[in-house]
UniProtKB/Swiss-Prot annotation:
GO cellular component terms given for this protein: cytosolic large ribosomal subunit
Basic and acidic residues composition bias: residue spans: 158-168, 178-187
GO MF assignments: structural constituent of ribosome
Ranges where the record places region Disordered: 158-187
GO biological process, one term: cytoplasmic translation
Species this chain originates from: Anopheles gambiae
PANTHER family: 60S RIBOSOMAL PROTEIN L17
Gene3D superfamilies: Ribosomal protein L22/L17 (3.90.470.10)
Protein's UniProt name: Large ribosomal subunit protein uL22
Pfam families cross-referenced by the UniProt entry: Ribosomal_L22 (PF00237)
Top-rank lineage group of the source organism: Eukaryota
Amino acid sequence: MGRYAKEPDNASKSCKSRGSNLRVHFKNTRETALAIKRMPLRRAQRFLKNVIEKKECVPFRRFNGGVGRCAQAKHWGTSVGRWPKKSAEFLLQLLKNAEANADYKGLDVDRLVINHIQVNRAPCLRRRTYRAHGRINPYMSSPCHIELSLTEKEDVVTKATDESEQAKKKLSKKKLQRQKEKMMRNE
């Protein structure tokens, strides 16, 4: 088992999943992974299923040369987007694996959030294509490694407010002096 690029802060409240040398385009997968980062698990699964059905698009921010525009990208504040079906299917499979790991650990699956997802390039696979005049050109593929970790979302606890603290507002020297004088008169 390899080392993860980022270990979770609280290992008992987290679960991980990874895939190596996956035969899916690196560039498309990188953009799809960035779209689901920091999403709750259920929302990310729904988003990826919508991408497969072309109901929601993945915004292409870095690798967007020659990528057409689509109206669904307005939701992300950009105009360039696509529906990388194979990338979405691979990520959905990894999320399913991470969910099974969380279930095994006894975590609450409905409170899981994707706090780390990373896509790295894997070694290229070489094939050949035959060209005119007896030439041969390379026909390369760009596989990738994917790793992700899910963490149970912490409940945000609001600080209890004291009435005495609210009453103690910061007063200017002038107002403090007036209060002292008023107290002296009353005595």
